[in-house]
Design a protein with these regions (language model features):
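Alpha-helical transmembrane segments and immediately membrane-proximal extracytoplasmic
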Residues: 1-425
Length: 425
């Protein structure tokens, strides 16, 4: 075979694969975009209803029992984001029943005042749809991995309106230092289509108005200091979530008792800390921190504790938006002490702690670009880099593996990766 024949053969194969993924990405984006928009609206209306009817908080224990029953009926007990990540890593099956289970469970949690996010739920639903669609189409294991990544990206994009960050996050979060770049085009295509669906239904993308300080040596040094502090908070956030996740079930092994007691405790702590401020995702507090420079000194600690308690007791949602809350409020409070504007420090904190908690450096920088329209991107990237480097080889997801070292340009040994995973467990 001469060079021309080789070129022609490779070109035909590439076009065939590109067409295959385009034909899959379009329906994937439409389906995840529609369901993601529906999920966004459901959580939004649940939040508005709870704000208008504060007594709904007292139904949280009953909502917890319903969620536990729902997961038992669908046989999804113990299934979460880690299972979806393992589906990408090793092809572990993900039940399609996870979609209605996490959808309804998250809406009930937000309706009745549980302190949780929504992006973790989006990753689970998108990953479940992608994996099962790939199975239905009888795709090979490596292609089903791409389908799972595309579903995750599409759902994430539909909720936040950040298609570029969504695609890269879905590609990179499973294995730190390893990126399946072949998944970019289908994942980004699905994310763009899902984003378009959300716009068509009137969902505004998540954007913040931000004024960045001048880029100079002094400002860069201050951002470095903030990044160091964010790394410590990121470690605290992840440690608290994992500690509660493993301790609470040992103290209350019965899931029915655990979720009911957890609901009662969340009610009590909500009244102790301030009803409404730490319930739900807390987007209003995030907006106040980033756009108005307003936050209470203890906001980030209260959110860490209530989110860890909510999720450990069996309520559903995600950890991503709580990481935004923790980062924005922490940055808003600490930034002025260092000499940074409160609003800008909140933005740096938001993206940096998300980065440290998820170990997704490039997606975090892209998220900062899309959330803040590129304002202060160099400084935000600097804060992310420092937090990423110092946050350690652990994060929100225990199934996440570290292929490369975060401190040196070297591969991690298999023994160390296993050690890290066992430490998380």
């Amino acid at each position: 075979m001469n060079d021309f024949d080789t070129f022609r053969h490779e070109a035909k194969a590439a076009l065939r694969v590109a067409l295959q993924w385009f034909l899959l990405a379009v329906p994937m984006g439409l389906l995840c975009g529609f369901l993601g928009t529906l999920f966004h609206l459901a959580v939004e209306h649940a939040t508005e209803l709870r704000a208008a009817q504060p007594w709904l908080l007292f139904l949280l224990p009953a909502a917890g029992l319903l969620i536990t029953a729902l997961y038992k009926v669908t046989k999804c007990e113990g299934v979460g984001t880690n299972n979806v990540l393992r589906a990408v890593q090793s092809g572990e099956p993900v039940s399609i029943l996870l979609v209605p289970a996490i959808f309804l469970g998250t809406v009930l949690t937000h309706l009745c005042g549980g302190s949780a996010g929504r992006e973790g739920a989006a990753l689970q639903m998108g990953g479940s749809i992608g994996w099962n669609l790939g199975t239905l189409l009888r795709l090979k294991d490596h292609d089903r991995r791409t389908a799972t990544i595309s579903g995750m990206a599409a759902f994430f994009s539909a909720l936040f309106g950040t298609p570029l960050a969504a695609a890269c996050f879905a590609m990179m979060v499973e294995d730190v230092g390893l990126t399946f770049t072949a998944a970019f085009v289908p994942a980004f295509t699905s994310a763009l289509i899902a984003y378009g669906c959300s716009l068509a239904f009137g969902i505004a993308p998540t954007h913040f108005a931000l004024t960045a300080p001048e880029l100079n040596v002094r400002t860069a040094l201050l951002v470095i200091l903030l990044g160091v502090a964010c790394a410590a908070v990121s470690r605290l956030f992840c440690y608290t979530l994992h500690f509660m996740e493993h301790t609470v079930p040992k103290l209350l092994p019965n899931p029915w008792v655990r979720v009911f007691a957890g609901g009662v405790l969340v009610i009590g702590f909500s009244y102790l800390f301030g009803v409404g401020r730490y319930n739900g995702a807390g987007m209003s507090v995030i907006v106040a921190a980033v756009e108005q420079g307003q936050a209470l000194p203890w906001d980030f600690l209260c959110k860490i504790f209530l989110t860890a308690l909510t999720l450990a007791c069996g309520f559903k949602g995600g950890e991503v938006v709580p990481s935004f809350f923790v980062g924005a409020t922490f940055g808003c409070v600490v930034g002025p002490l260092l000499g940074l504007p409160a609003e800008f420090a909140a933005a740096v904190g938001l993206v940096s702690i998300f980065c440290g908690a998820t170990n997704a450096l490039i997606p975090s920088i892209l998220l900062g670009f899309e959330l803040f329209s590129g304002a202060g991107l160099e400084l935000i990237a600097l804060g992310c880099g420092i937090c990423y480097m110092l946050s350690g080889h652990h994060g929100l997801y225990s199934s996440q593996t570290f292929v490369t070292n975060k401190l040196r340009s070297e591969y991690m040994s298999h023994k160390w990766r296993v050690k890290v995973k066992k430490a998380e467990e």
